Amino acid sequence: FVTGVQTCALPIFDLICVGKLNAKYFAEGVAEYQKRLAAFASFRIVELPEEKIEEKNASDAVVKKALDKEGRAILGSVRKGAAIVALCIEGKQISSEELAQFLADRANSGAGDVAFVIGSSHGLSDEVKRAAALRFSMGRITMPHQLARLVLTEQIYRACTINAGMKYHK
């Protein structure tokens, strides 16, 4: 113990994803940003299984049941006190600076832990969306969830560099 020296714990950022990252090139990209994030936060990736829906044209009730089960698993993976940031199509489109401000506000409030959530190909349950402190969308384009994971990981890193005053963001 050293008198007069204050240490601050790094925030914990969890990336909770439904489904696996199969493509090597996406996995390598995510791993690179995960490594870079170590200077700013403890960063953990949690992969949860996607509920199988057998019918090609499944009813809304079947999809809702699968989403609800995935949602319970997602919420069960969120650390106590962490803010949930849900990536969803109906979410708000935000800039890198706005994400940085959200993370800075969380850290300044003393509650810097954040759980970023990417649902399955069917989306997220209403329960997860209601629990989210922030719901955001990467835009109106459609992209594979594996690519979304890479882009989100890069944006988390970018937000951290913005908050640190680094030159990465232009």
Model regions: which residues?
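Single conserved hydrophobic/aromatic residue that forms the stacking wall/gate
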Residues: F1-A9
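Short, well-ordered alpha-helix to beta-strand connector turns
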Residues: A41, G81-A82, A132
